[in-house]
Swiss-Prot record:
GO terms under biological process: cell differentiation; motile cilium assembly; spermatogenesis
Protein name (record): Spermatogenesis-associated protein 6
Residue ranges, annotated region (Disordered): 176-225
Entry's Gene Ontology cellular component terms: extracellular region; motile cilium; sperm head-tail coupling apparatus
Residues making up the signal peptide according to the UniProt record: 1-17
Top-rank lineage group of the source organism: Eukaryota
Family designation: Belongs to the SPATA6 family.
UniProt lineage: Eukaryota, Metazoa, Chordata, Craniata, Vertebrata
Cellular localisation: Secreted; Cell projection, Cilium, Flagellum
Presence of keyword Repeat: no
Keywords linked to the UniProt accession: Cell projection, Cilium, Developmental protein, Differentiation, Flagellum, Isopeptide bond, Phosphoprotein, Secreted, Signal, Spermatogenesis, Ubl conjugation
Reported function: Required for formation of the sperm connecting piece during spermiogenesis. Sperm connecting piece is essential for linking the developing flagellum to the head during late spermiogenesis. May be involved in myosin-based microfilament transport through interaction with myosin subunits.
Claim: Secreted is one of the keywords in the record: yes
Length: 488
């Protein structure tokens, strides 16, 4: 492949020390200096965090300008490049930059006379810019540079890939013997294969991770923040495989669920049929299980209520009407109107003592067995017979007959259709009836002797007393309503 002529610029940089009198760093981690020239990153060895920082490091930066025809073109192109120095301390998680210094590469490589400390001395001193974490005076960097522009021969393919790689093909002549030794070694590398030389050239670029990034594992928040850095920083931290990260809002989390229902037992499945088919056909209510640590705080599971139309009973008053509606004692609990599925109580130990979580739900407390349904129906029938009877309405609204006569008639009616039923019931047999005396509503004392003399049992007298109490309550309610209407 034919070779073409090109100009190569070589920079020999020798870093001596960084001084900052009177400044003590709060962190004791090691410090190193990072340098970027010609787009190539290099770094010094780590030194203890005590000023002055003595590095005594020597570095060589080389770059080929294939399109330049004279040194003036090279100098003109150097104006578009910047030399950057960063003083970095290995503070977790990714290191902390203490101070920086940046200058145009042309002025950095070819300083003016006023930037030199002496006529025969090549040492230079520049003041670095402090970052907010460093207090006191600004650090001062002491270094020396040697720059050479030479002509070299490179292939046309290397000309096209010059922006990615750096080549060591031309000698760098200087009075110092160190550069000549490096030139002789670089000439020996010409005989190596192209694949191996390409690998060696890639290692010259600053593609290796920094020391601080190797010694620490960044947190997820640090990873997301590091993705917002510049492209140069992305290239330096490419080994972390950060990828595209985005900040997520807290509202993206799934809602917090408390209710929990255990799967039905096999016995229940056999009684009600297949759970999968029943869910599709009858519309069972499905409830999502909550987090495992929430289920431990539940005293017992909830009940699932299903109607034949596939809707839930959400209104507690509708459930109250169903419980208070008349029904017989022989009616099964699993009726056609309502189906109650009681899941097994949770066997998980209780770790939470909160009364709010241990308390049963409103629906469960409402449907608890504080009294059996037959007793509720019986009480409801008696109250409804008293309040909705034609005799009670006529007596309190229209009739002005004697109250004592009405009491006797009501007592006879009650004896006709109630006394026989309760006397035949073994629950209210003679040996189970109360044998002590008690006071009635009108001040009369009733006992077993009075019952034997008058020929009345305790049950009719008790019912008669209850009827009087309900009539008085109804009369008071009607009078209060009439007074309210008159006031309006």
């Amino acid at each position: 492949m034919p070779k073409v002529k090109a100009l190569q610029c070589a920079l020999a940089l020798e870093i001596r020390s960084v001084t900052c009198p009177g400044v003590v760093l709060k962190d004791k981690e090691d410090i190193y200096l990072s340098i970027c020239v010609f787009g190539q990153y290099k770094k010094t060895q780590c030194v203890p965090a005590t000023f002055p920082l003595v590095f005594n490091a020597r570095m060589v930066f080389e770059k080929v300008f294939p399109e330049a025809v004279d040194p003036g073109d090279v100098v003109a192109q150097l104006e578009y490049d910047t030399a950057v120095f960063e003083l970095i301390q290995l503070v977790p998680p990714v290191g902390e930059t203490l101070s920086t210094y940046d200058e145009n590469t042309r002025d950095f490589m070819f300083p003016g006379p006023n930037q030199m400390s002496g006529h025969h001395d090549s040492n230079r001193q520049v003041t670095m810019r402090r970052i907010s974490g460093l207090r006191g005076i600004a650090p001062k960097l002491e270094f020396s540079t040697t720059s050479v522009i030479t002509e070299c021969l490179i292939s046309s393919r290397k000309c096209r890939t010059q922006d990615k790689f750096t080549y060591h093909s031309a000698p760098v002549e200087k009075s110092h013997g160190r550069l000549q030794c490096r030139t002789s070694r670089s000439q020996k590398k010409k005989s190596k294969s192209p694949e191996r030389s390409k690998y060696c050239i890639n290692t010259k670029n600053y593609e290796q991770p920094t020391i601080s990034s190797k010694s620490h594992s960044p947190s997820p928040y640090t990873k997301r923040r590091m993705c917002e850095l510049s492209e140069d920083t992305r290239r330096r931290l490419a080994h972390l495989n950060l990828g595209p990260y985005e900040f997520k809002k807290e509202t993206d989390k799934p809602p917090f669920v408390i209710r929990h229902v255990d799967p039905p037992s096999p016995r229940t499945d056999n009684f009600f049929g297949s759970p999968g088919r029943d869910c599709e056909r009858d519309g069972w209510v499905r409830m999502h299980s909550d987090h495992p640590h929430i289920g431990c705080c539940r005293s017992k599971d909830y009940k699932v209520i299903r109607s034949p139309h596939g809707r839930d009973f959400e209104d507690p008053f509708e459930r109250c009407e169903e419980y208070l509606s008349p029904r017989t004692c022989s009616k099964p609990q699993h009726s056609a109107r309502t189906l109650l599925v009681h899941s097994a109580p949770s066997t998980t130990p209780k770790h939470c003592a909160s009364p709010v979580l241990n308390r049963a739900s409103l629906r469960e407390r409402f449907h608890s067995d504080w009294c059996s349904p037959p007793n509720c129906d019986e009480i409801h029938d008696r109250v409804k017979d008293v309040l909705k009877s034609h005799q009670a309405h006529a007596r309190h609204l229209c009739d002005e007959r004697d109250p004592e006569r009405e009491d006797e008639l009501e007592l006879k009616r009650s004896l006709l259709y109630r006394d026989s039923a309760y006397d035949s019931d073994p629950e209210y047999s003679s040996f189970q009836r109360p044998r002590g005396s008690f006071h009635l509503d009108d001040g009369e004392c009733w006992s077993n002797r009075a019952a034997s003399c008058k020929g009345k049992s305790h049950r009719p007298v008790f019912e008669n007393s209850m009827d009087k109490m309900y009539r008085n309550l109804y009369k008071k309610a009607c009078s209060s309503v009439s007074h309210t209407q008159e006031s309006f």
